[in-house]
Amino acid sequence: MANGVIPPPGGASPLPQVRVPLEEPPLSPDTEEEDDDLGKTLAVSRFGDLISKPPAWDPEKPSRSFSERDFAFHRHISHHTHHPLSARLPPPHKLRRLPPTFARHTRRKRKKEKTSAPPSEGTPPIQEEGGAGAHEGEEEEEEEEEGESETEAVEPPPSGSPQKAKFSIGSDEDDSPGLPGKAAFTKPLPSVGPRSDKSPQRSVSSSSPRARAPRVAGERSRPWSPSASYDLRERLCPGSALGNPGGPEQQVPTDEAEAQMLGSADLDDMKSHRLEDNPGVRRHLVKEPSRVQGGRGSRGGLTPTLRRKKKKQQPDRRPHEVFVELNELMLDRSQEPHWRETARWIKFEEDVEEETERWGKPHVASLSFRSLLELRRTIAHGAALLDLEQTTLPGIAHLVVETMIVSDQIRPEDRASVLRTLLLKHCHPNDDKDCGSFPRNPSSSSVNSVLGNHHATPSHGPDGAVPTMADDLGEPAPLWPHDPDAKERPLHMPGGDGHRGKSLKLLEKIPEDAEATVVLVGCVPFLEQPAAAFVRLSEAVLLESVLEVPVPVRFLFVMLGPSHISTDYHELGRSIATLMSDKLFHEAAYQADDRQDLLGAISEFLDGSIVIPPSEVEGRDLLRSVAAFQRELLRKRREREQTKVEMTTRGGYLAPGKELALELGGSDAAPEDDPLLRTGSVFGGLIRDVKRRYPHYPSDLRDALHSQCVAAVLFIYFAALSPAITFGGLLGEKTEGLMGVSELIVSTAVLGVLFSLLGAQPLLVVGFSGPLLVFEGAFFKFCQAQDLEYLTGRVWVGLWLVVFVLALVGAEGTFLVRYISPFTQEIFAFLISLIFIYETFHKLYKVFTEHPLLPFYPREGALEGAPEARLELNGSAPPPTEGPPGPRNQPNTALLSLILMLGTFLIAFFLRKFRNSRFLGGKARRIIGDFGIPISILLMVLVDYSITDTYTQKLTVPTGLSVTSPHKRTWFIPPLGSARPFPPWMMVAAAVPALLVLILIFMETQITALIVSQKARRLLKGSGFHLDLLLIGSLGGLCGLFGLPWLTAATVRSVTHVNALTVMRTAIAPGDKPQIQEVREQRVTGVLIASLVGLSIVMGAVLRRIPLAVLFGIFLYMGVTSLSGIQLSQRLLLILMPAKHHPEQPYVTKVKTWRMHLFTCIQLACIALLWVVKSTAASLAFPFLLLLTVPLRRCLLPRLFQDRELQALDSEDAEPNFDEDGQDEYNELHMPV
């Protein structure tokens, strides 16, 4: 130990008399093994200089006794002898020991409690010789076993020279107070090989692996001098081995070199330990490990005391979200050095543009393979400080610099320069322009010219135990020589201006629990070789003015070096920043215990990386395979991680940081409640839906108290009103006014309110659809052909519909929706789109027939209708009571109708395209695109209103709450017939059309509910397929009695409603796809939307201004937009396209071209068959033929195609897209409008 005294048993009891034999006894094998396990003592070779008159060696005298005064005198004078103990470290092969027995383990544990930790991972711990003997008096059962190993041999000095003997620090020795001189004894060191008694005793060499030259026993150690090289061997030495030429009376605990690295508390402790004489009290080398020497980069460098402390306060090893910032050493306009942010990572890399100093677009970081190898070598040889307990940047920088000195990366004279460089001011692109513009990659010559012509006085405020440089460094160390104004250069000072220029928008994109990583790289002229340090703090701390946003810092990486080497510091900084942004690597960085764990994580990163050959890439098409190859590597990487998690789980333990992942997505997660799962009991699914959904009824009302719900009501109101007006006008045309806009608005309002209050999924929007419009027209033609009352027949169809719905729900038949694949959905949507397009041009053809283009129009008698039309050609006359024919042969009517139809279509279509453009902001584009239909209707109505001398047919809307044709019907439809009795056979035969309309309602409602209930949409309150189908079917029977149209769940409007109530996460990395935070599931918005649609009946005067040609344009828009999201239409275009221009889609790359075209032709054949049926008198049967496509897909197609091909051609892989620049609902859905 430092004073070289044996502690008495009990700590304060008198020291016993120690008998030291003059002859060296033979060592038994057991004694040699114990000495080898306990370590070699650190011999001091120059202790003989302190002895003026050594006693004569008497071989006949067996032993002598030492008193307490001898020990006290030796303890006092031994403090002023400088012996660098780092030159006596054990060799490398002695550092690895065999597993000790329980007794040896106990002694080694006591010994480690008296030893300070090494400063870095690469430095082995200092082991003191005789350390185990310090505890021999504490265990009585060990005295006999340790007695032989504690003997000391005395060798006679050469004649004619002063005695030069060695003693072991902490060995048994004594001094006689009356002697003029004092003999020094040394404990023999057991050698590894065969032992020779005549061979000189060799001590342990340097701790550095590169210099382990053995020291001769009598060699004189070199005293420390300012000009000597201050390396690891001279740094790691106890205070008792420091030279002091002032004599024993000078009260100096240590030299300046060690004092400048220690705090005041450590210096006071050293003074009390080394200079105060407390008799009977044994003091150790260092009471507690120094902060500088207690590097966290080594597992074995922690004493048991620290291990117990860390066990009480374990650092947080749970992985957090990451924010990485790269700062480079730059020069501002005044040629002053500062740290400048050049890139940042949340998930993807964002670089600062050179000229404009603004952030570029996020992109995947591309790294050079050489920079990764250099980074691996840097971490392997640099400093690694893990779980560093510091809370300020000056404290962290001080320990980083000291560790660099200890690990021989920088010289001691560069301490102040490196420290001041680390504490320079940090500037960011969002800050004020006080930092000025800077060159992105300044040349090394310019940096060296500036850094070589400046001078700085290092000074910074004290931080706890970190000494002030002005007090402890003496003369100021030059950082930039020859600069008298360097004292005013800004440094990083705590409590300054704080985070200037914070980007609140960026802060919103960073997760709340994120911890930052700061990367500092740059060139400096005063270093001869690169110096690096990887730091992980024990807990995240908020460092003022370092980051552009106030995010706590957990990791730091420092890389400084000269400019004359070939290392690209910018690329090396990008490499470590990209690694820290990688999910698996930063998890490994949190859990790493030493640098080997970091190196292993780099190897894992390299295993999942892609190396692109150094060849020119002419276009993006040449890089198509890179994305697919990367996805394959990521899949294998996830499989390896999953395998590791499973192995650790089976082994009975979990790796650090894996507990949360298993809790969230592990095998122990609760199974999900499948609403389509059959219970086996009658109405079992309906009961489950009621129990699942109705308990959330109070929250369905509370969750509506948000401003987002108000905005959704206004938006969906126009989205629901536009189809109601469009389909109402077309329905009035098909049914000759028996049902029109009034009936459809009332039906939408009543059924919407009831469904929102009672439905299991209140986010569904019920409304009229294209398939129901086709069925209503087919059923009307059927009734006309059979001379039946259309409205009375609908009453009996509605009653049978209720019966069939009850039977289907009671048998839990909703599970059949699983068998409806995209094969059937695409056929259904494609057919309805074709019908919409055909009906649009057919209506336009009728307009041109009634109002042909003539070379001459007669002046008189041009109007064949009512006289009122002559007075107001384009006015809004009240609807006729009887139904006279409208005017015919009107000039310019056909052309104006064509203009209105195409104008409405083009405006709505291009506003939809504008939604996905780059103009304006994302929210503004989305609002404009979503309101495209109302905007186009409004503009074309204004155009028609401004042309007063041209006739156009207007929408027929009654005044007030009235039916469309009061002279034809009333609000209540008698089931037995109004004009004549309804035939009884038709009452029974109505079951057939009821079954057909059930097929349409079932497909649209259940598929819509299935789309809304996708896992990706994050609906938490559940759905109810049985309850929703029962409500819509039962309300359909009610609609028949009042002559209202049947409704179903409208797919596009329902998805739009859910998207409007979806709350997206703001903490999304730039460039990453948006993620759903929550969906406001409630019932109030549906009730308000339906109520507002019902109140629109009072706008009859406004609705009567809408020309039918405008509705034809909306009809055309619905048909065209529905085709854009269907895969069938895309594959249809591929038939006319060469194979080399086919897109990179699974149905192209995984299926042969001719087999893909065969699948497309089968779908086209089904569509043609349905079109033929729809065009004949048997048009009512088209829903039944549509249902037959389900068994066709399940039974016939597997015989023609392989499962792999069907998976590519008929897979439901569409996910909701919430990106502001993404596609709209029409592109995501395979269902008709």
Swiss-Prot record:
Q: Which reaction does it catalyse?
A: hydrogencarbonate(in) + chloride(out) = hydrogencarbonate(out) + chloride(in)
**Which spans does this entry mark as compositional bias, Acidic residues?**
137-153
Kindly list the positions at which Omega-N-methylarginine occurs in this protein. Answer: 296
Provide ranges: composition bias, Basic and acidic residues: 58-73, 268-290, 482-500
Kindly give the membrane topology term recorded for this protein.
Multi-pass membrane protein
Tree of life domain = Eukaryota
- Tell me yes or no: is Lipoprotein among this UniProt entry's keywords: yes
Q: Where are the transmembrane segments?
A: 710-732, 738-775, 795-817, 827-848, 894-911, 927-947, 981-1003, 1029-1050, 1084-1129, 1156-1192
Task: Cite the record's Pro residues compositional bias ranges.
Answer: 1-11
Q: Which PROSITE patterns match?
A: ANION_EXCHANGER_1, ANION_EXCHANGER_2
What biological process terms from GO does the record include?
A: pH reduction; regulation of cardiac muscle cell action potential; regulation of intracellular pH
Positions where lipid (S-palmitoyl cysteine) attaches: 1166
List-wise, which residues carry Phosphoserine? 168, 171, 176, 199
- PANTHER family registered for this protein in UniProt: ANION EXCHANGE PROTEIN, ANION EXCHANGE PROTEIN 3
Family designation = Belongs to the anion exchanger (TC 2.A.31) family.
Name used for this protein in its record:
Anion exchange protein 3
